[in-house]
């Protein structure tokens, strides 16, 4: 495991949160599509 500078940790957390939000949005869109069909 390579050691990362402390600055990277915060960026990684923000990215992870953003990814989770996107996944939630995609799931919501799929539910809406199923309801329309």
Curated annotation (Swiss-Prot):
Keywords: Ribonucleoprotein, Ribosomal protein. GO terms for cellular component: ribonucleoprotein complex; ribosome. The keyword Magnesium does not apply. Initially thought to be part of the large ribosomal subunit. Crystal structures show eS32/eL41 to be a small ribosomal subunit forming a bridge at the interface of the 2 subunits. Belongs to the eukaryotic ribosomal protein eS32 family. Part of the small ribosomal subunit. This is Small ribosomal subunit protein eS32. It comes from Pyrococcus furiosus (strain ATCC 43587 / DSM 3638 / JCM 8422 / Vc1). The lineage of its organism: Archaea, Methanobacteriati, Methanobacteriota, Thermococci, Thermococcales.
